[in-house]
């Protein structure tokens, strides 16, 4: 079977393309999948070719982001590509990352942190913490961790209003909770 994009090479990969409410499967050759074919915009930016080493994963990541954004009524193109911010290390933009399907280097995570958090929050309906199922053995640990975090926030507020006596009591409670947490960790 010939590649559905270039009609020149033998098709080797099956790619699912999702746009609006329509999912379409395409059979493409390795050349088209890797972005070396003229129909692919990545060919215009050869310095980013090194970031395209695992194309099947890249397609999957890109498709997941596009699907989730579309499902929740978000125009992924508009949200993701508002500005052309570049990573100081690898010089990739958010558009390049979405096109390739993965980050170019470790600094990309810090550079695009706010943009990615915004997209994930919109897709997840405002939730940024895991709220799904957890193993029963973890319930006590998670509850204890949350209690320590709440006490730390309360301690900061007490220090801000200079209620040092109450802050000392809360500090001691936090120490006790941390000790309890370490005991549970050692038992596990």
Swiss-Prot record:
Record bears the keyword Repeat: no
Q: Where is this motif: CXXC metal binding motif 1?
A: 3-6
Keywords, comma-separated and alphabetical? Metal-binding, Stress response, Zinc
Q: What induces it?
A: Up-regulated by heavy metals such as Cu(2+) and Cd(2+), but Zn(2+) and Co(2+) have no effect. Forms part of an operon with ctsR, mcsB and clpC, which is repressed by CtsR.
> Which parts of the sequence form the motif CXXC metal binding motif 3?
87-90
- Per the annotation, the residue ranges of the short sequence motif CXXC metal binding motif 4 are 105-108
Q: Which GO terms describe its biological process?
A: stress response to cadmium ion; stress response to copper ion
Q: Where is the UVR domain?
A: 145-180
Motif CXXC metal binding motif 2 located where? 29-32
GO MF assignments: cadmium ion binding; cobalt ion binding; copper ion binding; DNA binding; zinc ion binding
Query: Signal peptide location in the record?
Result: none
Q: Give the highest taxon in the source lineage.
A: Bacteria
Q: How does it assemble?
A: Interacts with McsB and CtsR; the CXXC motifs are needed for the binding.
Give the protein's biological function. Activates the phosphorylation activity of the protein-arginine kinase McsB. May function as an important molecule for oxidative tolerance in various types of stress including that of heavy metals. Binds to Cu(2+), Zn(2+), Co(2+) and Cd(2+) via its CXXC metal binding motifs.
What other remark does the UniProt record contain for this protein? The mutant where Cys residues of three CXXC motifs are mutated to Ala (Cys-3, Cys-6, Cys-29, Cys-32, Cys-105 and Cys-108) is still able to bind Cu(2+), probably via its fourth CXXC motif, but loses the ability to bind Zn(2+), Co(2+) and Cd(2+).
What's the protein name? Answer: Protein-arginine kinase activator protein
What is the species listed in this Swiss-Prot or TrEMBL entry? Staphylococcus aureus (strain NCTC 8325 / PS 47)
Phylogenetic lineage: Bacteria, Bacillati, Bacillota, Bacilli, Bacillales
């Amino acid at each position: 079977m010939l590649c559905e994009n270039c009609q020149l090479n033998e098709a080797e990969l099956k790619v699912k393309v999702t746009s609006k409410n329509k999912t379409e499967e395409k059979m493409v050759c390795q050349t088209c999948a890797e972005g070396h074919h003229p129909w692919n915009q990545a060919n215009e930016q050869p310095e980013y070719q090194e970031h395209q080493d695992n194309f099947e994963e890249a397609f999957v990541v890109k498709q997941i982001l596009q699907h989730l954004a579309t499902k929740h009524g978000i125009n992924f193109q508009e949200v993701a590509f508002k500005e052309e911010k570049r990573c100081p290390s690898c010089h990739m933009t958010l558009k390049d990352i979405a096109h390739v399907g993965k980050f170019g280097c470790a600094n990309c995570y810090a550079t695009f942190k706010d943009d990615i958090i915004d997209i994930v929050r919109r897709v997840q309906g405002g939730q940024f913490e895991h709220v799904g199922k957890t193993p029963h053995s973890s319930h006590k640990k998670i509850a204890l961790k949350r209690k320590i975090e709440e006490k730390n926030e309360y301690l900061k507020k007490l220090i801000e209003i200079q209620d040092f006596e109450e802050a000392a009591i809360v500090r001691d409670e936090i120490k006790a909770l941390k000790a309890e947490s370490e005991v549970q960790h050692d038992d596990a």
